[in-house]
Amino acid sequence: MKALLLTFGLSLLAALQAQAFPTTEENQDVSGTWYLKAAAWDKEIPDKKFGSVSVTPMKIKTLEGGNLQVKFTVLIAGRCKEMSTVLEKTDEPAKYTAYSGKQVLYIIPSSVEDHYIFYYEGKIHRHHFQIAKLVGRDPEINQEALEDFQSVVRAGGLNPDNIFIPKQSETCPLGSN
């Protein structure tokens, strides 16, 4: 469960083969506030594992050198926990790494304005994982963006039946219920 929680909470994103994704822009601006609208894993996750999961908006800040700092708070089993990580820019457009290269991610523009798909893979505690996440500038689910996300999930070899839509929360005071 810890590996699964860490995987979910970090929201870092990674790689499929480049031909499976749309062309990415060299200077895309992803700084600002983003809402996690949907996520899909390469493993089946029982509904009960995330039945009580709630997420706050992600804050992404562009750092010196093009790296990104990602922060948000997640409510799990009645407790709020702050998550934060730095995504290190690579020479390849829209490709980042985290945790000393153990996780690789791509930030892919959706065909729907103000939406991106974060796709990542890596290892946590010797367990390999792949995750795709749909994020947008507002908390409302956009059906067109969700359909685009489902197409990318399929193209990446993930099962669209494993898509999870988290509960949105504007705030989650640390340590609170």
Swiss-Prot record:
Classification lineage: Eukaryota, Metazoa, Chordata, Craniata, Vertebrata
Keywords from the UniProt entry: Disulfide bond, Secreted, Sensory transduction, Signal, Taste, Transport
Gene Ontology terms describing biological process: sensory perception of taste
Cell compartments where the protein resides: Secreted
CC per GO annotation: extracellular space
InterPro entries: Calycin, Lipocalin, Lipocln_cytosolic_FA-bd_dom, von_Ebner_gland
Protein name: von Ebner gland protein 1
GO-annotated molecular function: chloride ion binding; identical protein binding; signaling receptor binding; zinc ion binding
Residue stretches in coiled coil: none
Oligomeric form and interacting partners: Homodimer.
Gene behind this protein: Vegp1
Protein family according to the UniProt entry: Belongs to the calycin superfamily. Lipocalin family.
Matches recorded under Pfam families: Lipocalin
